[in-house]
Amino acid sequence: IRDYRGGGRSSGRETIGRVAAGAIASKILNELGISLCAYTKAIGPYVINETEYNYSEISQNSLYMPNNNIAEQAGQYITSLMKETNSCGGVIECIADGLPVGLGEPVFDKLDALLAQAVMSIGAVKGVEIGDGFQAASSVGSKNNDPFYVENGEVHKKTNHSGGTLGGMSDGSRLIVRAAVKPTSSIAIPQETINTAHENTEIVIHGRHDPVI
């Protein structure tokens, strides 16, 4: 049964099971010395650069952004979209510290691939980045490669453009994953569509729908 009022498999409400399972998984991982942190990096045109991060401010605003000033601007933007019955997208970033080296398989079950599959299975997610992601496409090898060095007998990286994975496996550095979320498709602005008789028509969606997921 598909409830036309919302709440079906394509609804954002489907994520409640993932949230519950994720909360439990986070506690288990914490016992293993692995810490997770996820937050909103961007809402519409309001993007927080890494140099502007303040992780202590994440829980201080309702948008879960690591910068209260930008969160306030993004909130005003969302309010304006609500008045226009429109919507916007955003970017979620997740970081994991304390991962052991070697998680993932080198071919079909690469850590990158498994993460991308899991994140892309979330409704409205249209893109996934690991590390520098799409920015790496405009870089050059000499800058994108992460230099290694040894300190006190341990191997480290000077940079982390790869986002914590190499050759499909975790390399012990911080894992960085981003998800691009499209604007909510259920809006009250008239849109062109077709009906069951294959006729051109318009649709206006009413009900409880969010201006951003």
Language-model features: locations:
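Glycine-rich, mobile lid/loop segments that gate access to catalytic sites or pores
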Residues: 2-107
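Glycine-rich anion/phosphate-binding loop at the beta-strand->alpha-helix junction
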Residues: 85-88, 92-202
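Active-site scaffold segments
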Residues: 18, 24, 176-179, 213
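Short acidic, glycine/tyrosine-flanked loop/strand segments centered on an H-E-D-like triad
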Residues: 1-8, 191-212
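Unusually extended, aromatic-enriched hydrophobic runs near protein termini
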Residues: 64-73, 137, 162, 205-213
